[in-house]
Amino acid sequence: MKNVIYKIIRIVGTVLAFFNLLMFYAMRPCWSGISKTIGYGTNKPTILYYLPIIICVLFLVVLLSDLILKKIFNKNWLHITYLVISFLFFVVVMVVIKLGAIDYMRFIWPKFFESLAYLAGILFLYFLIFIYPKLGLKENKFFKYGILGLCSIAVVLFLLHFSINRITYNPVVYAVEDKYQIVFSTNSEAKGWVEIGGVNYYDTYNGSDKKFTKVHKIEVPMATLDTSKSYTVHTQRSIYCGPFGGFMGRDISKTTSFRPVDTSDGIQYLSFSDVHMNDRQTEKTASFIEKYDFIVLAGDLISDVETFEDANFFNKVAYKVSKGEVPVVYARGNHDVKGRYGEELHKFVGAKGDQFYYNFYFNDVYGLVLDLGEDHDDDWWEYYDTAHYADYHEAQISFLEEEINKKNYDNYKYHLAVAHVPIVFVNYRKNHVHVKTEMTRLLNQMDIDMLLCGHQHDIMIFEPGLIEPNTKLTYNSAYKDDTYSGYLTDFNFPSFMISKPGYTFSDEPALSKAKSQIGLYVDVDLVNNTETCIYYNSRGEKVDVMNMYYEKHYGTEITIDLNTKVFTSR
């Protein structure tokens, strides 16, 4: 009986050692957060920055020594010792998860199982090399030829890049300038194109179809799709592409009806920000809104863009709320910068080339999208000297100056601006003071009717003329009895924040536990020149809101006079 118990102890200790290493390695998106939690960035020792790497190496050393020493000595006390060590490290992993990594578990679990798959492959090789020769199975022809056959098939399929092509992420129609960018993805490397009214528009690179990509982004004229009100995406897998010929797979297609922006009954739009993978809650909120002309997604739909699937998550959310039937406007968030695919994100969403600032035009709507990039200044420790946004910010200031000189916005009845990081709100760290001040000054000249923003994971309503600019803020006493050392810029336009998880204004759920994502619905009356703003939660309820930094309660509906920018509420 004792031998059985010690054998169980040995196995459990080794399994825990494997789990600790694989799980902590999968937590890579949270490593900088660990350093931050324990104080790095506040004049603490540099070793704190490298502590997560040191811990990961320590987990590896424990695992290897567990495997080697148990093999050499096979002592019961050794098994118990390693079980205790592995259990203590398991507690460390659980504490890290509890302190914040739990909000990233939807990233971490896929990475964990990916590592587990690699481990399974290594163990299979170990079995073939060290265990199989000692078994009676080596004399079994059926087993030997079965293994050989499976390995041969796997190698052939790998070499041929075998897959059955299909559309994995449905088409989303992004609005950029006077064009729509239709984006969809496939599980195989393939060519893609869009058919509208019998005319094909191709995903090309300098005249040649892109054949070795899984994400397909095709530009079409707005007027063409608005008139046709339907489009079909096509894809063909690239089986073989040689210098003098090739073979393409069968044509796979999907047809979607499209509803262009119709302002005959005014303008209605729905916006979300800081979804952070809560796509089901976002879809639920949108389901309660009967009609909207377009969608605005103001960034941070995910927390880290590390993989191809992460980059496609933007289109997953966009499709859930638009069904590919209405246009989507996208603004990049600070989390959308992070990860391996952050540099490739412009291929997956609406963007002007590789830039995330641009204008867009609908019937009676002039729109601007701005992008501050990261949420801290360039010298912030988390960016490890990889952030250099000064020129990018200046380019956007020049862009706004050019727009003012052209005055093209005067041809449109409604002026909408979008930026993930709030432009009129300067936080207590005083980040981006120059660019926010300059952007505010320029937007003040453009008769902006609404600036949508996110980032803070709160509902903040910035009403022009209500709070003295450039002065320390005091919280609404109904919300919090405290002051805030940030301030507001000197702005003359309404700005609404749309980044709140939860059901109510004061809810503060962890992202991983959020049962609701609050969105903002705006109904613009072009006859009376007003806009009515309503926050909705995932139960379809109107959210009762207040001004966070002023003693003012707005209720569930806010109506703004677009001429005077005066707010009335009920």
Regions found by a protein language model. Name each.
Residues Q236-G249, S253-T256, N312-N405, E438, ...:
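Extended active-site neighborhood of metal-dependent phosphoesterases/phosphodiesterases
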Residues D265-Q268, E290-I295, K323-V329, F362-G367, ...:
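Loop/turn elements at helix/coil->beta-strand transitions in domains of secreted/extracellular proteins
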Residues M277-R280, S303-E306, R332-Y341, D375-D379, ...:
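Active-site environment of divalent metal-dependent phosphoester hydrolases
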